[in-house]
A protein has these predicted regions:
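Alpha-helical membrane-protein topology signature
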Residues: 1-181
Length: 181
């Protein structure tokens, strides 16, 4: 497996989990909500680079959909512009390196559609739909991680499946690992 993809998956794991922690922790002030959205978005964009580097178009589409629904949660539009420009640059750079040869499995396409629908549900505050969609999508991303030997993606998707399961069961999240009934 490509070392670049492994490193990117590790960065995405840290950014996604930390951003998620800041994003949903209701004890924190509102500034952490915007910061959490930005860090989570960095994780999305890094996962787009991972998807491009392994040539999995469905992962790219899923992460781009998540990023699209995360952008309105920012307060700082300069950060939004910088992240969008970073995404365009990575798409061109990694696309050229792969000769724009991408694949998409049926499982990846289904996971992508489910993740994007979950992101839409998040934007509309339909939490039950979001939780179920993201658990299903992250289970598929665990499979993609195993298939491509991406430890960072495996850990991140596993963490999000666990978080989703606890939310479905009615637990309230506090921080990265803290839950109360």
């Amino acid at each position: 497996m490509d070392t670049c993809a492994q490193l990117l998956a590790g960065v995405a794991m840290v950014a996604g989990s930390y951003g998620s922690m800041l994003f949903v922790d209701t004890k924190k002030e509102a500034a952490n909500y915007s910061l959490g959205a930005q860090v989570f978005m960095l994780g999305n964009i890094t996962n787009i680079a991972v998807g491009l580097s392994i040539g999995d178009l469905s992962m790219v589409v899923a992460q781009a959909g998540l990023a699209f629904f995360t952008i309105p949660m920012f307060e700082n539009r300069k950060v939004s512009l910088a992240l969008v420009l970073m995404y365009i640059y990575m798409t061109l750079q990694l696309g050229v390196a792969n000769h724009f040869h991408f694949t998409a499995s049926w499982l990846g396409i289904a996971a992508s559609a489910t993740a994007v629908y979950g992101a839409w549900a998040m934007a509309k505050a339909k939490w039950d739909i979001m939780n179920w969609c993201w658990v299903v999508a992250d289970l598929a991303f665990i499979y993609i991680a195993i298939l491509n030997q991406l430890l960072g993606l495996f850990v991140l998707a596993s963490l999000f499946v666990w978080h989703g399961y606890l939310r479905i069961k009615g637990y309230k999240r506090h921080g990265l690992f803290g839950y109360t009934k």
